[in-house]
């Protein structure tokens, strides 16, 4: 186990452009809960070096809910789940665009439309593209998370002004068969590569709390590093009644913080955005995500669960002496 001085020295070497060997990085995620706070100085150093005290804010809209053919064990939208959720087909262009247009006058950086299902038809992608094209992207950048798409569909989004595509790996490859059996891990990897080839930046991360070991946390982090993704959404499982993982063991707040700090050391210059399960899993410790290395948060509601409202998150940033990220436009 590394001494506190060695931990900070590791972060300084990363800051200088060095890449520690994987064994050194593995020692960080393997630390016990009661030593998690020792990772904060290095993680905070790296976050501030690459991102200062500004925080990326993003908001999502569930554009198509439920009735998903896939069997992801954590997901309430799967047809295999018996969760009590609202299910509906793709909503109208106006309803897809309106939340994004309302964000134009707020500090929110990105607005994303997220849909259930393995993927969308080209007609549905066209609807989403037209909706997102109606948003002033100098005021709020647009993203999409529409499942497995082909190059032509990804190009359609790009041509509509969408600059980022979201598609999670969800878990380490060695765990994936326990998470989903209706599509492969490699299909997810290829979708990420296709989005990059289409000229889109990529938001790609996973969900923690699926039963992964420390080494599987590292396996996922190293895969994200190898894919050179631009942004990493970090979700912590909120077990939902009616899903295969409704009785999953709850993550400790300190483990959540250690995962964030580990990711910051592995992916020092990437946007790390804490998304689903932030308050549910971290409770009173959720403001510490920034000192653990997070450079962004998702604000507002999630797909089928509620989140914190924007006003509360802006007040939190002010209390911490942080500011919303300046808009790209």
UniProtKB/Swiss-Prot annotation:
Quaternary structure annotation from Swiss-Prot or TrEMBL: Homodimer.
Record bears the keyword 4Fe-4S: yes
Named cofactor requirement(s): [4Fe-4S] cluster; [2Fe-2S] cluster
InterPro entries according to UniProt: Aldolase_TIM, BATS_dom, Biotin_synth/BioAB, Biotin_synthase, Elp3/MiaA/NifB-like_rSAM, rSAM
Binding-site residues for [4Fe-4S] cluster, renumbered to this chain: 68, 72, 75
Family: Belongs to the radical SAM superfamily. Biotin synthase family.
Organism of derivation: Desulfosudis oleivorans (strain DSM 6200 / JCM 39069 / Hxd3) (Desulfococcus oleovorans)
Radical SAM core domain location: 50-278
A Pfam family reported for this protein in Swiss-Prot or TrEMBL: BATS
Gene that encodes it: bioB
EC category name: transferase
Positions that bind [2Fe-2S] cluster: 112, 143, 203
Statement: the UniProt record of this protein carries the keyword S-adenosyl-L-methionine: yes
Protein name as catalogued: Biotin synthase
Function: Catalyzes the conversion of dethiobiotin (DTB) to biotin by the insertion of a sulfur atom into dethiobiotin via a radical-based mechanism.
């Amino acid at each position: 186990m590394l001494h506190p001085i060695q931990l900070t020295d590791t972060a300084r070497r990363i800051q200088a452009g060095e890449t520690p060997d994987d064994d050194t990085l593995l020692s960080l995620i393997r630390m016990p809960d009661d030593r998690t706070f020792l990772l904060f100085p290095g993680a905070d150093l790296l976050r501030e070096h690459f991102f200062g005290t500004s925080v990326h804010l993003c908001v999502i809209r569930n554009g198509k809910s439920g009735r998903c053919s896939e069997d992801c064990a954590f997901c309430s939208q799967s047809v295999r789940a018996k969760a009590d959720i609202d299910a509906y087909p793709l909503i109208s262009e106006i309803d897809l665009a309106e939340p994004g247009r309302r964000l134009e006058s707020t500090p929110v950086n990105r607005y994303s439309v997220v849909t259930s299902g393995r993927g969308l038809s080209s007609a549905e992608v066209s609807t989403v593209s037209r909706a997102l094209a109606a948003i002033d992207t100098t005021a709020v950048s647009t993203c999409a998370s529409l499942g497995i798409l082909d190059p032509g569909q990804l190009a359609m989004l790009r041509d509509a002004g969408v600059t980022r595509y979201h598609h999670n790996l969800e878990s380490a490859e060695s765990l994936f068969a326990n998470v989903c059996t209706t599509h492969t891990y490699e299909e997810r990897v290829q979708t990420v590569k296709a989005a990059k080839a289409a000229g889109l930046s990529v938001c790609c991360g996973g969900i923690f709390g699926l039963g992964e070991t420390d080494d599987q946390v590292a396996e996922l982090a190293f895969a994200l590093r190898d894919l050179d993704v631009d942004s990493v959404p970090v979700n912590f499982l909120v077990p939902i009644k009616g899903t295969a993982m409704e009785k999953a063991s709850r993550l400790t707040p300190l483990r959540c913080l250690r995962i964030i700090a580990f990711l910051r050391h592995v992916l020092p210059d990437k946007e790390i955005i804490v998304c689903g399960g932030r308050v549910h899993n971290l409770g009173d410790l959720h403001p510490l995500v920034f000192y653990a290395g997070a450079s962004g948060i998702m604000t507002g509601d999630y797909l089928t669960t509620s989140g914190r409202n924007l006003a509360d998150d802006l007040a939190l940033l002010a209390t911490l002496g942080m500011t919303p990220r300046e808009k790209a436009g």
